[in-house]
């Protein structure tokens, strides 16, 4: 299978799974609207088909890392954290994040260890790619951003990471979408 075909397949599976999970949340607005009307998005963010970048990239010190992440949507909206897999990065969610943001969700998409602008704070910190370590990184990110509870979504390594988070810290997980994990 070519890399391009594999990338498109993963994107389709991830977007479909997230769409299936989040579709019921938007159905109330559609069901209560009058025939012939289209409900307005919850925020001023308009999803762009074929987007190639995020509106903003940020950094925050969290646990043993300085984590780079994209954020979209209203600051006080319900939080969705999307976790990429290996060897992908946050741009796997560049088409999904604006859709969730337009539906009123605060979307946080972090670069995992070794990706993008995420770096270790100390050269002495052991390098570890286990999903349990990555789950602890996402928990530290939630603490740094003062997020008490979030809907967690991920694919590949990200799926395993959110599975671990839901198992070890269920009080921090509102819901979970795990694709290929």
Regions found by a protein language model. Name each.
Residues 27-63:
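C-terminal segment of N-terminal export signals and the immediately downstream linker at the start
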Residues 63-71:
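A short loop-to-beta-strand scaffold at the N-terminal edge of the catalytic core in hydrolase folds
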Residues 56, 82, 108, 153, ...:
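Conserved Rossmann-like nucleotide-binding pocket used by diverse enzymes
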Residues 62-63, 102, 109-155:
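Active-site loop/oxyanion-hole signature of alpha/beta-hydrolase fold enzymes
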Residues 92, 124, 133-137, 161, ...:
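Ligand-binding pocket scaffold of soluble enzyme catalytic domains
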Residues 2-20:
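N-terminal secretory signal peptides and thylakoid transit peptides that target proteins
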Residues 148-181:
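Conserved hydrolase catalytic core segment
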Residues 72-119:
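Conserved HGGG/HGGXW glycine-rich cap/lid loop of the alpha/beta-hydrolase fold
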